[in-house]
Each structure stands twice: as structure tokens, then as C-alpha cells.
Amino acid sequence: MTGRFITVEGTEGVGKSTNLAFIEGFLRSRAIDVITTREPGGTPLAEELRELLLAKREEPVDACAELLMVFAARAQHLNQLVAPALARGQWVLCDRFTDATYAYQGAGRGLSLETISKLEFLVQGSLQPDITVWLDIDVRLGLERARARADLDRFEEEDVSFFERVRAGYRARAEEAPARFCRINAGQPLAQVQTDIQRALEAFL
């Protein structure tokens, strides 16, 4: 039996880490064997690529180089962790996936969506998440939350206009795949956010 693939998406400061833990706990309470992972990352090599991708540096990072690092990490992650787990019948819960690439590198950086689509097919074929929980929030509120943390990565230091484009990119993805996307208002109190997430997951199950 093939497992199910759940992804959690959103811009900075939406509370992904907290809500990923909530989703994992909810699934385990239903006796579901779930692996929680993240992108970029999830395997030793993919985590090394993540560090390269997020590190602040004096040298400007070319947008195309950024895109290729994302997909290099994804190829390793999919082939070494995600696909084998799904084949064993385990569920995979992933912090970000290809929707983030369309949002950040496509809408945010202005790279060709056609190019991203070609790389997507090369790396993952027809594999798509079964459900995507999109934690959506006003960009300024999200950045205020994110920047309350001391150590910001290269992406978290981008300006508001970048994240407005990213949010619009997520909105476009949700409009293209409404059956897969579940938008959650992440600007609400946490208890309400998690009530909404649980309701969406119960409908999915």
C-alpha cells in the first residue's frame, strides 16, 4: 500500500514548525505511521545543500544557481527518503516542497515558471502531494514574527515586496490546484489555526 504525502507551505513567520508538530501528533493519534521531514534538507547531503542555500554571504547568489541548488537537494531527498517511505506505506509530512519553489524562485525571484516545471518533471515525475496545508498570513505580520528571532537566514532578510510576490505565487498555486490546497488563516490565534488544520485533515482522512 502506498503512503500519503502531506506538505505544509507558507511564507516566513506563519508558524510552520509549531503546526508541523501539531499535524504529526494528530496523525500519530490516528495510528498513522508518519515521517516528518523538510525541504531543502531531509538527508545529510540535502542538509548540506540547505546550508549553502540559506547562508548569508558577500557574493550575490544568482537566482538560477539558487533554483538548481533547491532541485539538487530535492532530487536527493525524494530518492533517498520520500519515495522509499511512500513505497513502504508510510505517510510523509514535509515542511515545504515544490510549491515553495514556484513561490520563492518563480514569483519571488522572477524565474520562468516553465523552467521550474521542466525541472519539477525531471526530478519528481508525476509525484505530487496528496494535500497541501497552506498557512497564509499578512506578509508584514509574518515578517514581524520571523524577525523577532535573533538569527535570520538569507531569505528572511529579503524585503516586504519580495514576500508579497511570494505570497501571490502561493495564491496562484492554490488557484491552480484547489482540490489539493487547503488555505489556513495563520494570522488567527494558534488554537483556532490548529482547529482549522485538524478540520481539514479530518476531511482528508
Curated annotation (Swiss-Prot):
GO terms for biological process: dTDP biosynthetic process; dTTP biosynthetic process; dUDP biosynthetic process. Keywords: ATP-binding, Kinase, Nucleotide biosynthesis, Nucleotide-binding, Transferase. GO terms for molecular function: ATP binding; dTMP kinase activity. Gene3D superfamilies: P-loop containing nucleotide triphosphate hydrolases. It catalyses: dTMP + ATP = dTDP + ADP. One of its GO terms (cellular component) is cytosol. Its EC number is 2.7.4.9. The keyword Aminoacyl-tRNA synthetase does not apply. It holds the Pfam family Thymidylate_kin. Disulfide bonds: none annotated. The keyword Repeat does not apply. InterPro entries: P-loop_NTPase, Thymidylate_kin-like_dom, Thymidylate_kinase. CDD domains: TMPK (cd01672). ATP binds at residues 10-17. Coiled coil: none annotated. Phosphorylation of dTMP to form dTDP in both de novo and salvage pathways of dTTP synthesis. Belongs to the thymidylate kinase family. This is Thymidylate kinase. It comes from Teredinibacter turnerae (strain ATCC 39867 / T7901). The lineage of its organism: Bacteria, Pseudomonadati, Pseudomonadota, Gammaproteobacteria, Cellvibrionales. The gene is tmk.
